């Protein structure tokens, strides 16, 4: 196959400009992957010891390795010319002796030029679990118990790829049920994470729940209006060891030896401290890079949930409602109230000091029915959730409206816009009138005008306040419905959110920066 270039002036020569032709001789990429997944599940009943007793063993092993083999080639290219253009005759094209025989000059050669391997990825993990279970009924009473041990390890994580992540846990649970009316459950978890120092590595997390089905009581009249009513509640403590990119914060302080970046500029080619005035000498030295935090531990959350389940009209209308609260403590964050001089220029590690409370509700209502061969359902739901920062080691601001503590996580803070500057706001020489609050930067007519909240006639950081809601919506709505008729099914889903704010895209922000202009279509319908 010949690859032609520069042949546009030769209409009779076929052009190699097809999409696939452009890749001819370029080479290829070959992805090689190898995956293996192994799962094991064994159950042994121990009824010969006592009825309802059993043991379970579970395990899994997964491995994945892939790489891309790259081969890049070089090809011959053929450039067409008229013979008289390359034979040295130097004849003009209008000369009768000009030879228009098409000849080709060849450049390069067909060969595979480079080889390589890249984009390597690897993954490996295993999980092991052993449990002993007991479930048995004694007349109207049902009891259950579980004792479970699990352990897992994941290799090649994104951070510290040579150090796998490891977890170990012990779980205990007991359950009780009386006549399917009264239900209770208690469980406790004892979990360990390699993210913490040995004396902080394990955490204990208890939880309990109760339920009461009122419609199972003898005194509750059987009727078609309310066919099922259950009230329930739960409370529990959970732990979180997900530290994102902050693994091993508990390790001792780290140091750098002979770092020249902290010397005077005139001695930037030296390492260490400079001694002397005339016969100067430098000594090798070390400095702290980061301070360890041996007290880093689990982030905890005390969660509560209270709800009801109710069915009406022969179970055609179903209602589920929940109210929840969550008090999250020991959130890992940086301390901001410590001066940088004391805190080693920001080298302090995050500590477990953050506190956030959250509360909300969820309501789900569904109607379903069948009319001969046609069945249908209508389902609507709404959820509300709002959090509040209780503590985040915030430095006391100059103005009370600047506090971020007490607001939602992720609340939008900024300047309050009050329209745009007009030509009447400026003097004849283009400077801003002195009776107006003085902003930072060189403002021009059309720029955004910001509010002077503290009345000091200056627009600065002391005028920053909450201007919007977090990105995460406080309200989430849903409506879905569908129907089925003799094997034909159709459905539709609607979703919506409220009390959330998104930042404008760059296309809408750009006109307000630098020397950009605001187009009329962007201004129409605003303010």
Label each PLM-derived region with a short phrase:
Residues 51, 470-503:
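Glycine-rich, aromatic-lined ligand/substrate-binding cores of catalytic
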Residues 247-263, 370-471, 502, 509-527:
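Conserved small-residue
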């Amino acid at each position: 196959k010949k690859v032609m270039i520069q042949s546009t002036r030769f209409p009779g020569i076929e052009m190699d400009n097809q999409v696939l032709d452009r890749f001819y001789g370029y080479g290829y990429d070959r992805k090689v992957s190898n995956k293996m997944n192994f799962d094991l599940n064994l159950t042994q009943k121990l009824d010969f010891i006592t009825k309802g007793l059993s043991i379970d063993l579970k395990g899994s092993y997964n491995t994945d390795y892939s790489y891309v083999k790259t081969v890049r080639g070089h090809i011959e290219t053929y450039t067409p010319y008229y013979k008289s253009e390359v034979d040295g005759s130097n004849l003009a094209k209008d000369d009768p002796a000009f030879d228009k025989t098409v000849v080709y000059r060849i450049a390069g050669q067909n060969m595979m030029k480079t080889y390589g391997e890249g984009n390597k990825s690897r993954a490996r993990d295993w999980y092991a679990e052993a449990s002993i279970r007991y479930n048995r009924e004694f007349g109207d009473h049902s009891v259950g118990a579980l004792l479970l041990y699990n352990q897992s390890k994941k290799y090649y994580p994104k951070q510290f790829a040579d150090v796998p992540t490891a977890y170990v846990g012990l779980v205990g649970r007991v359950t009780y049920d009386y006549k399917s009316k009264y239900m209770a459950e208690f469980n406790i978890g004892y979990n360990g994470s390699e993210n913490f120092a040995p004396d902080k590595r394990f955490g204990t997390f208890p939880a309990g729940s109760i339920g009461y089905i009122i419609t199972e009581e003898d005194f509750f009249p059987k009727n078609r209006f309310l066919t099922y009513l259950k009230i329930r509640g739960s409370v529990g403590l959970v732990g979180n060891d997900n530290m994102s990119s902050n693994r091993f914060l508990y390790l001792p302080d780290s140091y750098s030896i002979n770092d020249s970046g902290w010397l005077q500029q005139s001695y930037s080619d030296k390492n260490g401290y400079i001694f002397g005035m005339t016969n100067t000498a430098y000594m090798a030295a070390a400095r702290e890079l980061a301070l360890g935090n041996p007290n880093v531990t689990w982030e905890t959350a005390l969660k509560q949930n209270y709800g009801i389940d109710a069915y009406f009209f022969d179970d055609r209308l179903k209602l589920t409602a929940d109210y929840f609260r969550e008090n999250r403590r020991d959130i890992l964050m940086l301390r901001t109230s410590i001066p940088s001089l004391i805190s080693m220029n920001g080298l302090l590690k995050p500590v477990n000091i953050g506190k956030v409370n959250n509360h909300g509700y969820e309501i789900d209502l569904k109607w379903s029915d069948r009319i001969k061969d046609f069945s249908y359902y209508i389902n609507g739901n709404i959820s509300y959730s709002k959090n509040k920062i209780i503590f985040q080691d915030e430095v006391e601001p100059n103005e009370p409206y600047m506090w971020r503590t007490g607001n939602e996580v992720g609340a939008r803070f900024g300047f309050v816009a009050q329209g745009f500057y007009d030509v009447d706001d400026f003097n004849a020489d283009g400077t801003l009138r002195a009776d107006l609050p003085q902003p930072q930067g060189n403002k021009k007519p059309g720029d955004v005008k910001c509010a002077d909240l503290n009345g000091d006639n200056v627009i600065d950081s002391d005028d920053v306040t909450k201007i919007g809601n977090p990105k995460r919506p406080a309200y989430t709505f849903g409506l879905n419905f569908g129907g089925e008729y003799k094997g034909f099914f159709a459905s539709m889903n609607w979703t919506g959110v409220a009390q959330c704010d998104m930042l404008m895209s760059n296309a809408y922000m750009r006109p307000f920066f630098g020397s950009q202009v605001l187009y009329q279509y962007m201004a129409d319908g605003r303010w």
